[in-house]
From Swiss-Prot:
Keywords from the UniProt entry: Allosteric enzyme, Cytoplasm, Hydrolase, Metal-binding, Protease, Sodium, Stress response, Threonine protease
Lineage of the organism: Bacteria, Pseudomonadati, Pseudomonadota, Gammaproteobacteria, Enterobacterales
Gene3D superfamilies, alphabetized: Glutamine Phosphoribosylpyrophosphate, subunit 1, domain 1 (3.60.20.10)
Reaction it catalyzes: ATP-dependent cleavage of peptide bonds with broad specificity
EC numbers, comma separated: 3.4.25.2
Protein name from the UniProt record: ATP-dependent protease subunit HslV
Molecular function terms from GO: ATP binding; identical protein binding; magnesium ion binding; protein domain specific binding; threonine-type endopeptidase activity
Organism: Escherichia coli (strain K12)
Places the protein is found: Cytoplasm
Consequence of substituting residue 3 to S/V: 80% reduced protease activity
Temperature-related behavior of activity: Optimum temperature is 55 degrees Celsius.
Length: 176
């Protein structure tokens, strides 16, 4: 699978992901970019799950952002509704982590839109390791959001066999 982590701190929000794509227990590619900017660079998003499925969801989510003039929560809820009710979309297997200057959300294929505690998101096979590392760093250091995300991904990559050390990182700054 993969690891995606999002951290928000001191006027910065980061989403970072590794680059490993696997087919069963075989590494197919090591430099997949699972994190990208959407909606005129005002939203960042990362995915865990099937690559083709995730790119389809990115496109649909960007359309929802355009329909709702960039309102992240409304777009996320509308995508989740469609994902849950559309027969074809229901077959897509992926999780999305999305963020803008006001919110960080997880969108699932079950129709869930979750705003996590402490604006910390970690999804994918290495998610629990990245979440534990990021939480410890948030609570016990003054590292930046970007540094925390990078270190959390490094730790997850050391432990999870489906996570590598090729990182894609996107960051938004806002007035805290």
């Amino acid at each position: 699978m993969t690891t995606i982590v999002s951290v928000r701190r001191n006027g910065h929000v980061v989403i970072a992901g590794d680059g490993q794509a696997t087919l069963g227990n075989t590494v197919m590619k090591g430099n997949v970019k699972k994190v990208r900017r959407l909606y005129n660079d005002k939203v960042i998003a990362g995915f865990a799950g099937g690559t083709a499925d995730a790119f389809t969801l990115f496109e649909l989510f960007e359309r929802k952002l355009e329909m709702h003039q960039g309102h992240l929560v409304k777009a996320a809820v509308e995508l989740a509704k469609d994902w849950r009710t559309d027969r074809m979309l229901r077959k897509l297997e992926a999780l999305l982590a999305v963020a803008d200057e006001t919110a960080s959300l997880i969108i699932t294929g079950n129709g869930d839109v979750v705003q996590p505690e402490n604006d910390l998101i970690a999804i994918g096979s290495g998610g629990p390791y990245a979440q534990a590392a990021a939480r410890a760093l948030l609570e016990n250091t003054e590292l930046s959001a970007r540094e925390i995300a990078e270190k959390a991904l490094d730790i997850a990559g050391d432990i999870c066999i489906y996570t590598n050390h090729f990182h894609t990182i996107e960051e938004l700054s806002y007035k805290a």
